Amino acid sequence: MAEPGPEPGRAWRVLALCGVAVFLAAAAAGGALVAWNLAASAARGPRCPEPGANATAPPGDPPPGVDDLRRRLAEAAEREEALARQLDQAESIRHELEKALKACEGRQSRLQTQLTTLKIEMDEAKAQGTQMGAENGALTEALARWEAAATESTRRLDEALRRAGVAEAEGEACAAREAALRERLNVLEAEMSPQRRVPRPRPRSGSRPRPSPRSRSRSGPSGGCRRPARRARG
């Protein structure tokens, strides 16, 4: 990446200095040209004097304003050289400023490209966020359905467990009744065992044998109560 260019205030000051230097150089060149013309006209000699004027002046002496004009011409030449040096410095600074300006333009172009890339990435991120929001909504709806199904399954399981408990209690009660009936049956059998030793008359042909008290007791109202199998809980 290019180095940062000079500050804007400094650049304007340098440009103003360049303008002033150019103006002073032009003024100095104009002054030097005027002084040169005056010196040249003075060197060519004065106009023809009137008769009797300056009769006492020596013929080899220069006019009175030539030395002053030569001094002013030398000063103007020095100022012109100084202004030329300043102009060269201003030109060098101008080249540096142009170089810095090109570097700034290059940086601006790269920053613009990066900004465009960031905008594209931001748009893509927004699109992905919208898609993820829709997917999250669908997942939330599915989760709600699953929770409702799980709640219904839990309710059914609780109902089944409750029914299993009721059936188990009924089975235990039935088993208790069956045990009581068996105990009573055993007592009756014990009481009837002496009566079995007495010989009974043979039944007539065609008549059905009367059922024994044991068979009647076994075919009682209990009907062989069976204990229901326990269901595995949860």
UniProtKB/Swiss-Prot annotation:
Source species, domain of life: Eukaryota
Region ranges (Disordered): 44-67, 187-234
Compositional bias segments (type: Low complexity): 187-196
Assigned keywords, A-Z: Coiled coil, Signal
Biased composition (Basic residues): 197-217
Name by which UniProt lists this protein: Coiled-coil domain-containing protein 194
Coiled coil region boundaries: 66-163
Signal peptide range in chain numbering: 1-42
Entry keyword Protease: no
